[in-house]
Amino acid sequence: MLEKQNSEENIELLRAMRYCYNKSKIFYAVRISISILIPILSISIYLFNRGSTGTSNTGVWFSVIGSIWLLIAYQIEKLEGGYIEKGAKIQEKFDINLFNIRWNNVLVGNQISPEDIRDFSSKFKGDEEKLKNWYGGLSSKHFYVNVILAQRSNLMWAISLKRNFSILLFTVSVLYLFLTIAFGFFVNMSMQEYIIKILLPSMSILIYGFKTSDELKKQSNKLEALGNSIISKFDTGNLSEINASACREYQDAIFVYNRIRSILIPEWLYWLRQQKDDEKMIQINIRLTKKSNLF
């Protein structure tokens, strides 16, 4: 299995997968950047006009812009989700190639065409070396033990990223809300001014922050429960339960909770933790592999 993951066909799948996820992150970056820019501009213009004796409807216009942007951001999020779905299906194909389990057409749907995979792969501009040896530390004499440990790696790697990003989003969102309220008191804003000039223009980014933080927390808890259920099989020695059918069930959960509903994590956070999390995952896989070889 480990040798097969570096075959030309499977590396092409990983290249295509990476391209799709990177493309979705471009839409994500645009969506978040503009959502942040709108309230910043609203506050800046308010400060600029603060000493003016005339009246200004700028705050009202930014409230309108913020409301319209919510609708535009929703459409951008749909484009973002389309590339996430393509990337998830291509990653599913990669796993199916390695794990010797069937494609779940009912859950996953149709496969991405070979032509689209080739097209996406050719557009990938990243470092191909980082795609090699996708799964590590697997040397059990039981094939499906290697499979389920690879699946657990997918689950546990995601938990670390999701929890850290969830905490970051919640902290920043709460901090932003309190700072803007404090700013309103400091400049003696009325409640109406605060709502029109700060809160309404900020709604898209605040909704994203709190909603995404909550969703990431729920996903990480679900993934942790799945990961722990795999560990329990090793603790009890019930390796006979680890077969193609069981692995397909875990693969379904990975697709639902960790891929198709995936919330994009910033690239810098992903690479910041990659080496540390990879090393930890490989060591755990080696330990569990040795344990499985005793049976």
Curated annotation (Swiss-Prot):
Top-level taxon of the source organism: Bacteria
Protein location: Cell membrane
Entry's transmembrane regions: 26-46, 56-76, 167-187, 190-210
Segment forming the signal sequence: none
Membrane topology: Multi-pass membrane protein
Keywords, in A-Z order: Antiviral defense, Cell membrane, Membrane, Transmembrane, Transmembrane helix
One GO term of the biological process aspect: defense response to virus
Keyword Cell membrane listed: yes
Pfam families documented for this protein: S_4TM (PF18159)
This protein's record includes keyword tRNA-binding: no
Gene Ontology CC terms: plasma membrane
Induction: Part of the CBASS operon consisting of cdnD-IK1_05631.
Functional description taken from the UniProt entry: Effector protein of a CBASS antiviral system. CBASS (cyclic oligonucleotide-based antiphage signaling system) provides immunity against bacteriophage. The CD-NTase protein synthesizes cyclic nucleotides in response to infection; these serve as specific second messenger signals. The signals activate a diverse range of effectors, leading to bacterial cell death and thus abortive phage infection. A type I-B CBASS system.
Name of the protein in question: Probable CBASS effector molecule IK1_05631
Organism per entry: Bacillus cereus (strain VD146)
